[in-house]
């Protein structure tokens, strides 16, 4: 199977105390943190193309442009979705969105690159 424009992924999570800006260390309030929202969006992107990936390959995030639009309290459900909008060789571009139970909380674009899992790990650990 190949990666095509229009592929979609969706993931869900509930906001826990450890997901808050205060606990993550990027703010002082007990509201859903931007880093956790971004991680969920990246998870949705991975989900969108998971079935098309060869077992020896993976994707790595290389670019992200996201706006966090609204605060979400602990206890609410979050849904993130990603849609493939372009495929240029090994570079995959996604439109990403996140929602809580009251509406959209984040949106943007995300790029991932297809890599050989083993070669990528070898290169990373060669730094040691």
PLM features: what roles do these ranges have?
Residues 1-32:
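Catalytic strand-loop segment that frames the active site of acyl-thioester-processing enzymes
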Residues 46-79:
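Hydrophobic beta-strand-centered segment that forms part of the acyl-chain substrate-binding groove
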Residues 113-128:
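C-terminal output/interaction extensions
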Residues 97, 110-111:
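Residue-level structural signal for beta-strand termini and adjacent loop
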Residues 14-16, 111-115:
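Short beta-strand edge segments in extracellular beta-sheet folds
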Residues 66-101:
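Hydrophobic beta-sheet segments that form the core/acyl-binding groove
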């Amino acid at each position: 199977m190949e990666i095509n424009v229009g592929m979609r992924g969706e993931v869900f999570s509930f906001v826990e105390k450890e997901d808050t800006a205060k606990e993550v260390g990027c703010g002082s309030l007990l509201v859903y943190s931007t880093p956790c929202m971004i991680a969920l969006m990246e998870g949705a992107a991975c989900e969108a193309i998971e079935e098309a990936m060869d077992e020896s390959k993976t994707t790595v995030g290389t670019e992200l442009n996201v706006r966090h639009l609204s605060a979400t309290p602990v206890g609410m459900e979050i849904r993130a979705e990603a849609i493939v909008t372009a495929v240029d060789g090994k570079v995959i571009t996604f439109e990403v969105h996140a929602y809580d139970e009251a509406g959209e909380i984040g949106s943007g674009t995300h790029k991932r690159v297809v890599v050989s899992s083993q070669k990528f790990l070898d290169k990373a650990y060669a730094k040691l």
